[in-house]
């Protein structure tokens, strides 16, 4: 197994242009596919999850042209649904942002489609989405365990009507349903059961749908109306914002060891909820400066916080490791959906924080972290989870440094993360 040793870092300073957002990249690729016209996507993320989506679209007959560095894509829309005369089997790795939306989109047309992935994907639930699609007439068959991939779709289109979908596990299910609803045969009324988690991710979806010409009536996130007869139309160009979750590591670095760290590609005009991570750093005592498309973090002594972070679940992981450098006990609440991500992130985070000496209480949907007097060095297991590797890079700011196991797992969203991280040092 590959290991990366991060030696102690005294101070960080510099500027990082954040690569494109994973959430926006895969949503935009699918909407561009369903749209009339050709769409040019710029600042597209070049990572494993996006490659799985692109490979699947190509297999489904979508024509696109990628730039040499894979960050610009010119895609010819189908002007409607995806159909195939021959049976198709698509491998989607561990890419939830490809599996869930494609599962929904492939029910719209005609054909037989089988969706598979890595072993971890077979443990990531999709039942709430499939239950909703079945209410609209979809024929979806699980191939192993009910409620989980792999699965086969025998597509004949979706009817309109009323549909209920659970919102308390993952917002990706609602995102997938929203994106396909305009192409159903009739108007769709979506009723959300339970408290909707990660609402800012739904805002990303609605903003992109509007960019492609579709209107959704949002009744306070409890009900969504999508009138029949709408069509996605290419806006011509789509600029993919920098990934706000990826920005969190560099902003935390500035807060812990700044110096001054500036991230560009996200700012106060961002449609991503994870930019609110900077507000949490500010509550902890960091000096934060906002621009339209940049955020600056400057360091100071951090103090612990006790907050509901359901609205920023991915970026909240960075608070868990930043908490090691804060005075007091930090509590991150309402984060049950950490458990159904690339790994069970609550269990993984608790295990690895204890390795470096932290006192950790792991609840069903919260984590409580008290930093040790002296942070220990350790070998950090990353569980094939990109965010575990990037979060624990913060331990380079301890006096003893840290070793990251399987550092290349960052290829899921940020292949050159550690190179960029090193550029801030000195």
Swiss-Prot record:
One of its GO terms (cellular component) is cytoplasm. It is an enzyme of class 2 (transferase). Its EC number is 2.5.1.19. GO terms for biological process: amino acid biosynthetic process; aromatic amino acid family biosynthetic process; chorismate biosynthetic process. Phosphoenolpyruvate binds at residues 22, 96, 124, 172, 345, 387, 412. GO terms for molecular function: 3-phosphoshikimate 1-carboxyvinyltransferase activity. InterPro entries: Enolpyruvate_Tfrase_dom, Enolpyruvate_Tfrase_sf, EPSP_synthase, EPSP_synthase_CS, RNA3'P_cycl/enolpyr_Trfase_a/b. The active site is at residue 314. Pathway: Metabolic intermediate biosynthesis; chorismate biosynthesis; chorismate from D-erythrose 4-phosphate and phosphoenolpyruvate: step 6/7. 3-phosphoshikimate binds at residues 22-23, 27, 170-172, 198, 314, 337, 341. Keywords: Amino-acid biosynthesis, Aromatic amino acid biosynthesis, Cytoplasm, Transferase. Its main location: cytoplasm. The keyword Glycoprotein does not apply. It is found in: Cytoplasm. Monomer. Belongs to the EPSP synthase family. PANTHER family: AROM/DEHYDROQUINATE SYNTHASE, PENTAFUNCTIONAL AROM POLYPEPTIDE. This is 3-phosphoshikimate 1-carboxyvinyltransferase. It comes from Shewanella baltica (strain OS185). The gene is aroA.
């Amino acid at each position: 197994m590959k290991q990366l040793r991060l030696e102690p870092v005294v101070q960080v300073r510099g500027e990082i242009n954040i690569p494109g957002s994973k959430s926006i990249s895969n949503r935009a690729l699918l909407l561009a596919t369903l749209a009339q016209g050709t769409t040019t996507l710029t600042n597209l993320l070049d990572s494993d999850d996006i490659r799985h989506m692109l490979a699947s679209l190509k297999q489904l007959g979508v024509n696109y042209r990628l730039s040499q560095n894979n960050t610009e894509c010119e895609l010819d829309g189908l002007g409607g649904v995806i159909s195939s005369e021959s049976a198709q089997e698509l491998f989607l790795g561990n890419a939830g942002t490809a599996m869930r939306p494609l599962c929904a989109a492939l029910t719209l047309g005609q054909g037989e489609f089988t969706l598979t992935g890595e072993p971890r994907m077979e443990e990531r639930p999709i039942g709430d989405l499939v239950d909703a699609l079945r209410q609209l007439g979809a024929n979806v068959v699980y191939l192993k365990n009910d409620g989980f991939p792999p699965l086969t779709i025998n597509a004949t289109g979706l009817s309109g009507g009323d549909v209920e979908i659970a919102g308390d596990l993952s917002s990706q299910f609602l995102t997938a349903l929203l994106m396909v609803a305009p192409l159903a045969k009739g108007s769709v009324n979506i009723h959300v059961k339970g408290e909707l988690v990660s609402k800012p991710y739904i805002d990303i979806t609605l903003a992109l749908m509007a960019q492609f010409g579709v209107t959704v009536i949002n009744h306070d996130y409890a009900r969504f109306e999508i009138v029949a007869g709408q069509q996605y139309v290419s806006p011509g160009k789509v600029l993919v914002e920098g990934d706000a979750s990826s920005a969190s590591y560099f902003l935390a670095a500035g807060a812990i060891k700044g110096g001054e760290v500036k991230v560009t590609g996200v700012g106060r005009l961002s449609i991503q909820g994870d930019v609110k991570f900077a507000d949490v750093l500010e509550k902890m005592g960091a000096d934060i400066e906002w621009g339209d498309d940049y955020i600056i973090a400057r360091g100071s002594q951090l103090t612990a916080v006790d907050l509901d972070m359901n609205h920023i679940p991915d970026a909240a992981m960075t608070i868990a490791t930043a908490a090691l450098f804060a005075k007091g006990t930090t509590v991150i609440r309402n984060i049950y959906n950490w458990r159904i991500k690339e790994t069970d992130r609550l269990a993984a985070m608790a295990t690895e924080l204890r390795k470096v000496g932290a006192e950790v209480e792991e609840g069903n949907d919260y984590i409580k972290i008290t930093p040790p007097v002296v942070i220990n060095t350790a070998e950090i297991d990353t569980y094939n989870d990109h965010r575990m590797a990037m979060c624990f890079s913060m331990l380079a700011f301890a006096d003893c440094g840290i070793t990251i196991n399987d550092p290349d797992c960052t290829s899921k969203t940020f292949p050159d993360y550690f190179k960029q991280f090193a550029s801030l040092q000195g």
